[in-house]
Amino acid sequence: MAAKFLPRFWRSGSQAELLDFQNNNVVAEGKLDFEHGTLKGKSGRYGDDEEDVRRGHIEDLANHSLLNKLLRRTLVDSPHNVEVLQRDPTSPLFSVKSFEELHLKNELLRGIYAMGFNRPSKIQENALPMMLADPPQNLIAQSQSGTGKTAAFVLAMLSRVDANKKYPQCICLSPTFELALQTGKVVEEMGKFCAGIEVIYALRGNRPGKGSRLEAQIVIGTPGTVLDWCFKLRLITVENISVFVLDEADVMINVQGHSDHSVRVKRSMPKSCQMLLFSATFEDSVWAFAERIVPDPNIIKLKKEELTLKNIQQFYDQCENKEQKYSALCNLYGVITIAQAIVFCQTRKIASWLSQKLSDDGHQVALLSGELPVYDRADMIQRFREGREKVLVTTNVCARGIDVEQVSIVVNFDLPVNVDGSVDFETYLHRIGRTGRFGKKGIAVSLIENFFVYMLKEIEDHFNTKITKLNSMDMDEMGKIWK
């Protein structure tokens, strides 16, 4: 008998029911609602650009991860090595080259192969022996998107579950509603041959009655709701939890309340509980958070693909104001339609204004911003990948991890800045890194208002590169950038 994985509010698993569930569970006005993957606020409350930047920055962290999960069809074949730091350096270091070496149950092996995994990814080679060890070992792991880390911790949970015990045994915390559902989808696919194992979603709106008895062995949810289920509703007996997973830690710490709720849930776990934490990045703040969650961990890092500027010609055009930048972009438009192009804006407000103005003036463009539901964003990116859209106006949601080979020019309508107004060097690198992919020549043009010219010098110094001045009003000069 196949396992039952559908939550009570999503019995049929249809997209329509999921969207209906989201639409009928609106939070109070003015609150940031990341359990539903969206920002809901009283109309007009966040009218200034600075607040728009802050909100967009936080939301992009979560949606970037979800978009990559929706868009990737295969694992990333990274050429970089895995760095392993063991809790006990004297212990032998094991890695595996096949799933058979892990001595998994046959039904789990069938599920893995049915998902299309033929061999472990680089992070799985090293992480799985640690995650499946007896006695269990704690783990902190860093990896880029698409390296198979979700499948790795799902395999660990399914391996630890006792199907004969009808109560929660594993908890997985995700920062948003949609990311939790994506993790549940992996559980469903990998565990479809495992009889008697169920999963339930601890998400806002899915509220079993007080005193209800949960029979699902795996609980996937957002921190606040899981905390309520553990202590307010007493649906979960924390002493029975054998595996605690915290996914997307770098997103979690940027969402107000999530980090504190996560720590409170973790502190209630028994000492024997295995702690697994995953993050795409590990700035100091993430490390500090990880250390509060995971005691005595093994640590695994998979180095990110290094972006290079060597194939990218960088230009800038100095403009008086937004309207002059728009005129410069229109002059560029005759050049950028030669191939596919991405135009980056700092805020959703500017992106919406720009795409509408371009459309009104007869230019064919597509808009990708945080105002679109995330599944619509995935569809838009897929259309762009397939060449059905030639020019994409977007915010930073498209700055990382979206590889489109045909993109030959990137335009920064606004330079990327941090919340404090300083240059966001990493986002600049990732933005212009959308062109010049796979060894091809790429072009990046930044449209700079007079007040922000000093930022160009900072970018040049930071990357030890040269950004050439361009006069977008000189069409002869414009044509030369392709030669």
UniProtKB/Swiss-Prot annotation:
GO biological-process terms attached to the record: poly(A)+ mRNA export from nucleus
SMART domains, sorted: DEXDc, HELICc
Keyword ATP-binding: yes
EC class: hydrolase
Places the protein is found: Cytoplasm; Nucleus
EC number: 3.6.4.13
Amino acids binding ATP: S143, Q144, S145, G146, T147, G148, K149, T150
SUPFAM superfamilies, per database record: P-loop containing nucleoside triphosphate hydrolases
Motif (DEAD box): 247-250
Tissue specificity comment: An mRNA component of germ plasm. Localizes to the granulo-fibrillar material (GFM) of the mitochondrial cloud in stage I oocytes. Associated, at a low level, with the periphery of mature germinal granules in later stage oocytes. Localizes to the vegetal cortex in stage II oocytes and segregates with germ plasm during early embryogenesis. In adults, expression is restricted to the ovary and, at a lower level, to spermatogonia, spermatocytes and spermatids of the testis.
Motif (Q motif): 97-125
Helicase ATP-binding domain boundaries: 130-300
InterPro entries with a match to the protein in the record: DEAD/DEAH_box_helicase_dom, Helicase_ATP-bd, Helicase_C-like, P-loop_NTPase, RNA_helicase_DEAD_Q_motif
CDD domains in the cross-refs: DEADc_DDX25 (cd18048), SF2_C_DEAD (cd18787)
Catalytic activity: ATP + H2O = ADP + phosphate + H(+)
Helicase C-terminal domain boundaries: 311-478
GO molecular function, one term: mRNA binding
Gene3D superfamilies xrefs: 6.10.250.2170, P-loop containing nucleotide triphosphate hydrolases
Gene Ontology cellular component list: chromatoid body; cytoplasmic stress granule; mitochondrial cloud; nucleus; pole plasm
Cysteines paired by S-S bonds: none
Purpose: ATP-dependent RNA helicase.
Family assignment from sequence similarity: Belongs to the DEAD box helicase family.
Protein's name according to its UniProt entry: ATP-dependent RNA helicase DDX25
Organism encoding this protein: Xenopus laevis (African clawed frog)
